[in-house]
From Swiss-Prot:
Assembly and binders: Homododecamer.
UniProtKB keywords: Amino-acid biosynthesis, Aromatic amino acid biosynthesis, Lyase
Protein species of origin: Pseudomonas putida (strain ATCC 47054 / DSM 6125 / CFBP 8728 / NCIMB 11950 / KT2440)
SS bond partners: none
Active site positions: Y23 (proton acceptor), H101 (proton donor)
Highest taxon of source: Bacteria
Enzyme Commission numbers on file: 4.2.1.10
Protein name, UniProt field: 3-dehydroquinate dehydratase 1
Family: Belongs to the type-II 3-dehydroquinase family.
KW Metal-binding (keyword) present: no
Length: 151
């Protein structure tokens, strides 16, 4: 049984009401519930945290190493374009991660085109709405299964 951690950055607590044209009508609670059910059905454990505070996300990443978290799914939200500290935390714990964005950041304002995470992530999923989280979970589970196979 693997343990996966889902991290949601700033303002994602407002999903469902915040700019639904960009982010959709699905709430964060619905996303977490869907992911938790899918992980459990596959025999795995899922943890999650949403925070508007960078240091809380960093502290949670640090704790993940000591808890034996096997994979991280992260939507850094606005921290995508600003947070070297979050990037450094992810690199420091050496837990593979997938970067997720609800909207297609490349179709938005130019300042949203740069990510401090994409070049060190296992993969990036953007622009697919809440389905992006499901696809990221499926990919993480596939990778964990492949890595568990004897070579």
């Amino acid at each position: 049984m693997a343990t996966l951690l889902v991290l949601h950055g700033p303002n994602l607590n407002l999903l469902g009401t915040r700019e639904p044209g960009h982010y959709g009508a699905v709430t964060l609670a619905q996303i977490n519930q869907d992911l938790e059910q899918r992980a459990r059905a596959a025999g795995h454990h899922l943890l999650y945290l949403q925070s508007n505070a960078e240091y809380e996300l960093i502290d949670r990443i640090h704790a993940a190493r000591n808890e034996g978290v096997d994979f991280i799914l992260i939507n850094p939200a606005a921290f995508t374009h600003t947070s070297v500290a979050l990037r450094d935390a992810l690199l420091a714990v050496s837990i593979p991660f997938i970067e997720v964005h609800l909207s297609n950041v490349h179709k938005r304002e130019p300042f949203r085109h740069h990510s401090y995470f994409s070049d060190v992530a296992v993969g990036v999923i953007c622009g697919l709405g809440a389905s992006g989280y499901r696809l990221a979970l499926e990919s993480a589970l596939e990778q964990l299964a492949a890595n568990a196979q004897p070579k």
